[in-house]
Amino acid sequence: MSALGVSVALLVWVAVLLLVSIWRQVHSSWNLPPGPFPLPIIGNLFQLELKNIPKSFTRLAQRFGPVFTLYVGSRRVVVVHGYKAVREVLLDHKDEFSGRGDIPAFHAHRDRGIIFNNGPTWKDIRRFSLTTLRNYGMGKQGNESRIQREAHFLLEALRKTQGQPFDPTFLIGCAPCNVIADILFRKHFDYNDEKFLRLMYLFNENFQLLSTPWLQLYNNFPSLLHYLPGSHRKVMKNVAEIKEYVSERVKEHLQSLDPNCPRDLTDCLLVEMEKEKHSAERLYTMDGITVTVADLFFAGTETTSTTLRYGLLILMKYPEIEEKLHEEIDRVIGPSRIPAIKDRQEMPYMDAVVHEIQRFITLVPSNLPHEATRDTIFRGYIIPKGTVIVPTLDSVLYDNQEFPDPEKFKPEHFLDESGKFKYSDYFKPFSAGKRVCAGEGLARMELFLLLSAILQHFNLKPLVDPKDIDISPVNIGFGCIPPRFKLCVIPRS
């Protein structure tokens, strides 16, 4: 080896030692949770399986314990695994860990709205939005009638399939999308409306793309990948198109606004903006309102739609469960009356199935990232302000002590020995604490009423033998994505 080669090798070696020394000093000075040693630039990327990051978290938790530290690039991440640790983060330290971790794919919504907002306005905007949603019937009788009305449209659309195979992705999605559209815009779309179908396509495509390995990479190395071609560009383009549509609706609402008679949530937000017109510090702006409404539109459509669709696939896999549901529906509701939320008390098996669907699919397995709002002592460790916190929901929903055989779909997980519904505090698909899903009450009502209505009127018929149906997700990242499938719905006599 030449003298120059030896010199370069020594310089590289010294640089590596220096980086290791700096990392150890920083790590020890903060008394962070344990974790694997990070490499320069990429951090612990090689410890993560990009096609199934939750699986990687489980493996690392077995090695380092329920609270451990990772570095993804230069970003410090503390992963919290298991019921006790997750509960402590979300509830016992709800203020300290209430920030929103950065999601670069949604930078168009950063520091605005209620989902991706990590700015000073999110608490006030979220509080007002939740209050307004409750006033418009979120989780109460007002939304029950909304969902029941939409169930009629859904059932009619299903009848029009005439027992022929169809892909349920968008037909099923029309119902929850129309429910949230009514709350936001006081608008009902026809199931064949091209703009309506386009919006649902954008919602669905983004949810799928966010769960791909490329988006996992992009969200952790945005500065390196931003200018490269890739699906992150498609996500951002879709976000911009959705935002443009919502912006047009908000402008239309402003032009016809009557402050004394708000028609929907968008009007209520605009009324607050008008009140602040002469204020030096404004909480509500046109752009902020647009992002808030877009957040609710996306979340209120895609999560419930995907859960319902995944639920239908699971029920076709287990026809004996579907048959038990038919029997309970016939006994409690009968063939004619539309299902009501009061029926849930008399339908423990349906209630258990709805809960088990949500537990089993673990729609957002690693939660949305939180962030430490200040230096915090947690379980004897010091978590610095700005640290990304990942409370893994799948580790709670798949706890094998609370849910024996968690990898199996078993409604009995939510039934006691007498067949009555049994609630579990481990049931946290909507997260908990300051960042709990704003639409939890609405989603729970939609899932029960819409699934009950479908099974009241139809038998589900798969195109293959139930034993051959694969209910494994095709991607596990931001969400758990079900496989595409077709089915037939056969009217019950």
Swiss-Prot record:
Protein name, entry field: Cytochrome P450 2E1
Subcellular location: Endoplasmic reticulum membrane; Microsome membrane; Mitochondrion inner membrane
Topology in the lipid bilayer: Peripheral membrane protein
GO cellular component: cytoplasm; endoplasmic reticulum membrane; intracellular membrane-bounded organelle; mitochondrial inner membrane
Catalyzed chemical reaction(s): an organic molecule + reduced [NADPH--hemoprotein reductase] + O2 = an alcohol + oxidized [NADPH--hemoprotein reductase] + H2O + H(+); (5Z,8Z,11Z)-eicosatrienoate + reduced [NADPH--hemoprotein reductase] + O2 = 19-hydroxy-(5Z,8Z,11Z)-eicosatrienoate + oxidized [NADPH--hemoprotein reductase] + H2O + H(+); (5Z,8Z,11Z,14Z,17Z)-eicosapentaenoate + reduced [NADPH--hemoprotein reductase] + O2 = 19-hydroxy-(5Z,8Z,11Z,14Z,17Z)-eicosapentaenoate + oxidized [NADPH--hemoprotein reductase] + H2O + H(+); (4Z,7Z,10Z,13Z,16Z,19Z)-docosahexaenoate + reduced [NADPH--hemoprotein reductase] + O2 = 21-hydroxy-(4Z,7Z,10Z,13Z,16Z,19Z)-docosahexaenoate + oxidized [NADPH--hemoprotein reductase] + H2O + H(+)
GO biological process: epoxygenase P450 pathway; xenobiotic metabolic process
Function: A cytochrome P450 monooxygenase involved in the metabolism of fatty acids. Mechanistically, uses molecular oxygen inserting one oxygen atom into a substrate, and reducing the second into a water molecule, with two electrons provided by NADPH via cytochrome P450 reductase (NADPH--hemoprotein reductase). Catalyzes the hydroxylation of carbon-hydrogen bonds. Hydroxylates fatty acids specifically at the omega-1 position displaying the highest catalytic activity for saturated fatty acids. May be involved in the oxidative metabolism of xenobiotics.
GO molecular function: arachidonate epoxygenase activity; heme binding; Hsp70 protein binding; Hsp90 protein binding; iron ion binding; oxidoreductase activity, acting on paired donors, with incorporation or reduction of molecular oxygen, reduced flavin or flavoprotein as one donor, and incorporation of one atom of oxygen
Subunit details: Interacts with chaperones HSP70 and HSP90; this interaction is required for initial targeting to mitochondria.
Class in the EC hierarchy, top level: oxidoreductase
Species name: Macaca mulatta
Keywords carried by this UniProt record: Endoplasmic reticulum, Fatty acid metabolism, Heme, Iron, Lipid metabolism, Membrane, Metal-binding, Microsome, Mitochondrion, Mitochondrion inner membrane, Monooxygenase, NADP, Oxidoreductase
Highest taxon above the source species: Eukaryota
SS bonds (residue pairs): none
Protein residues bound to heme: C437
Record-linked CDD domains: CYP2C-like
Pathway it works in: Lipid metabolism; fatty acid metabolism
Cleavable signal peptide: none
Binding site for substrate: F298, A299, G300, T301, E302, T303
EC number: 1.14.14.1, 1.14.13.n7
InterPro entries noted in UniProt: Cyt_P450, Cyt_P450_CS, Cyt_P450_E_grp-I, Cyt_P450_E_grp-I_CYP2E-like, Cyt_P450_sf, Cytochrome_P450_fam2
SUPFAM superfamilies, alphabetized: Cytochrome P450 (SSF48264)
Coiled coil (UniProt feature): none
